[in-house]
Amino acid sequence: WALLKNDFPQLKLHMIGKLQTNKVKFALPLFDYIHSLDSIKLAEKISVEQEKKNFKPKIFIQINLGKESQKSGIDEDNLANFYQKCVNEYKLNIIGTMCLPPFDEDPSPFFKKMQNLSEILKLKEISMGMSNDYLDALKFKATFIRVGSKIFGNRS
């Protein structure tokens, strides 16, 4: 991807999924967007690397609205403080929020909560919704959706 990125600068690459702190130095030169900021430790690492690389990716804070133990993300009760710390102390370019609602529940209440949280923080971008629920996500102002299965089919 690094070679292609240089040849096609108009392409913007998005990092989705868990970003490990030890991979940040490799991810920063490659990805224009990071959809999964989920901890202070990761925020610190991105801050250090963006200074070294002189590049600030556009970042979404991942929120664990379903309070699921198997998923990463900031608890909504800590979101405002986390956001302020990321912007003011770590100088991160936070542009939005991201969530993955519980798979076995109606996603609409979670999408509505994301819309409200984003409005409170005055963030314009919301990354939520996948092939099975993107239409619901769009009703609640999602600006980035993931529809790989709709385009390419289910994984085998």
Each predicted region: which residue ranges?
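Expand to "…catalyze enediolate/carbanion chemistry for C-C bond making/breaking, isomerization
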Residues: L138, I151-S156
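Active-site-proximal glycine-rich helix-loop-beta segment
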Residues: K141, G148
